[in-house]
């Protein structure tokens, strides 16, 4: 998740030692990166949730000038604490319509079972639709990639849809 407001960043966990993410430092770091590599492509990911759906990130996006802006509707994993409804998600998207040429938005249905994720233990994992956490494969190095891949739900059509 990303926010420009300190209190929102604290609520959504964008913090270090109880101090909110430094927005100005982030902008300076992006400037440094671009001075080193002027052709680098910057992608911003935003997870829209109950604390940031009404925020405007327009000034931030205008300053960063990313190549791509991925906007995700928060996926409830363990509970609904940060959940929003479709109307709130669309509200955020409508408020940022001027960036539609770089926005790629994904709702919960589009995200579920469409990512290949590997945890620090070397296991594939996927979200479980009933908000009970994750489903894990056995470790890839123990059973092989093919067997581990068969142990999790994955929808290739959804995966490919993001790259068309």
What are these regions (language model features)?
Residues 2-6:
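A glycine-centered beta->alpha junction motif in the catalytic cores
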Residues 7-125, 129-163:
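Radical SAM enzyme [4Fe-4S]-AdoMet core and its adjacent flexible, acidic
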């Amino acid at each position: 998740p990303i926010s420009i407001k300190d209190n929102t960043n604290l609520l959504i966990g964008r913090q270090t030692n109880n101090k909110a993410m430094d927005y100005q430092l982030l902008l300076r770091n992006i400037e440094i990166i671009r001075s080193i590599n002027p052709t680098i492509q910057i992608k911003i990911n935003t997870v829209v949730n109950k604390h940031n759906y009404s925020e405007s990130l327009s000034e931030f996006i205008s300053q960063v000038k990313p190549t791509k802006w991925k906007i995700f509707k928060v996926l409830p994993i363990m509970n609904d604490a940060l959940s929003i409804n479709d109307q709130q998600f669309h509200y955020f998207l409508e408020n940022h319509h001027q960036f539609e040429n770089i926005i790629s938005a994904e709702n919960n249905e589009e995200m579920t079972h469409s990512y290949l994720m590997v945890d620090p233990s070397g296991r594939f994992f996927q979200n479980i639709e009933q908000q009970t956490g994750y489903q894990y494969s056995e470790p890839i190095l123990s059973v092989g990639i093919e067997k581990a891949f068969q142990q999790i739900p994955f929808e290739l059509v959804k995966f490919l849809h993001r790259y068309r």
